[in-house]
From Swiss-Prot:
Residues 62-83, 101-128 are annotated as: Disordered. The lineage of its organism: Eukaryota, Fungi, Dikarya, Ascomycota, Saccharomycotina. Keywords: Cytoplasm, Nucleus. It comes from Saccharomyces cerevisiae (strain ATCC 204508 / S288c) (Baker's yeast). Its main location: cytoplasm. Residues 101-114 have a biased composition (Low complexity). It is found in: Cytoplasm; Nucleus. Present with 300 molecules/cell in log phase SD medium. GO terms for cellular component: cytoplasm; nucleus. This is Uncharacterized protein YER084W. The keyword Oxidoreductase does not apply. The keyword Electron transport does not apply.
């Protein structure tokens, strides 16, 4: 099984070239051409020694289960050892259905819960 790892975005060199070429800089205000740094950047990256690594690095994994998880690509519970879930946060009380609701949902005819009209209770401090 081969694993392909993208080391950097494929458009990073082009984006950096365009960004440095079209964005004005403080050097441009002082009399330096704004594309000077861009040309230096591109000329440095044309030298083979300074070229970034290839876009995709092949890494052959014969048995993935025998390899420990990589810190660059954390998976599972080892992703962040500082984050620990407490059992109290995972527990929820069981849902219970009242007998009145169970009886009303089993019948097909609509059932009224109360015969009295319901009026909302308003506190006195909110009354004008």
């Amino acid at each position: 099984m081969e694993e392909l790892i993208c080391t950097y975005p494929y458009h990073s060199n082009l984006f950096m070239f365009l960004f440095l070429f079209f964005c004005p800089s403080k050097r441009a205000r002082r009399g330096h051409p704004k594309f000077l740094f861009t040309l230096c950047y591109k000329s440095n990256h044309l030298i083979p020694k300074l070229l970034p690594p290839s876009l995709f690095t092949k890494r052959v994994m014969l048995n993935p289960s025998s390899h420990p998880p990589s810190p660059d690509f954390p998976t599972g519970s080892s992703a962040s050892p500082r984050v620990k879930l407490r059992p109290s946060t995972l527990w929820a009380p069981p849902l219970t259905v009242s007998s009145d609701f169970a009886a009303s949902s089993s019948s097909t005819a609509p059932v009224t819960v109360t015969d009295k009209p319901v009026t909302p209770a308003v506190s006195k401090r909110y009354q004008p």
